Amino acid sequence: MITVIQRTGSARVRVGGEVVGEIERGLVALVCAVHGDGSAQAQRLAERVLGYRVFPDAEGRMNGSALDLGCGVLAVPQFTLAADTRKGMRPSFGPAADPQTGQALFETFLEALRERATGPVASGVFGADMQVELVNDGPVTFWLEAPPRPAGPV
């Protein structure tokens, strides 16, 4: 699984003009499942998002995590992160998990966040046309992955 996280002062996501998810200080996580992902990747990615140290300490170094500080997480499903853009002028979404699998893994990711988070967890709606608003803090943006385990003996 893939996520792009952005540190934010506040963020919200709308569907059909209605706010469906909103947080104050925290992280926006754009989330995508790819072929071969399973619940282990969704849970590992949730752990990484919550534990990734992107918030400044008293000396200005990135030493605080959303988990440490009780910050919120706004999770937004975004299959376009799996795009293959290596050739041509049109992205290919072949690497993305099929919609049914993607939705199930997004829900597993959300459940894992909610089980572990010390702050609020909000989300967008899988498969919906969403409008995301955020106040980027920094800006601080990272690409995180929880790749599928390679096939073969363990």
UniProtKB/Swiss-Prot annotation:
Give the record's keywords alphabetically: Cytoplasm, Hydrolase, RNA-binding, tRNA-binding
Please name the SUPFAM superfamilies in this protein's record. Answer: DTD-like
Where does it reside? Cytoplasm
Subunit composition and interactions: Homodimer.
Q: What PANTHER family does its record include?
A: D-AMINOACYL-TRNA DEACYLASE 1, D-TYROSYL-TRNA TYR DEACYLASE
Name the family the entry cites. Belongs to the DTD family.
Role description? An aminoacyl-tRNA editing enzyme that deacylates mischarged D-aminoacyl-tRNAs. Also deacylates mischarged glycyl-tRNA(Ala), protecting cells against glycine mischarging by AlaRS. Acts via tRNA-based rather than protein-based catalysis; rejects L-amino acids rather than detecting D-amino acids in the active site. By recycling D-aminoacyl-tRNA to D-amino acids and free tRNA molecules, this enzyme counteracts the toxicity associated with the formation of D-aminoacyl-tRNA entities in vivo and helps enforce protein L-homochirality.
Q: What is the recorded name of this protein?
A: D-aminoacyl-tRNA deacylase
Q: What organism is recorded for this protein?
A: Halorhodospira halophila (strain DSM 244 / SL1)
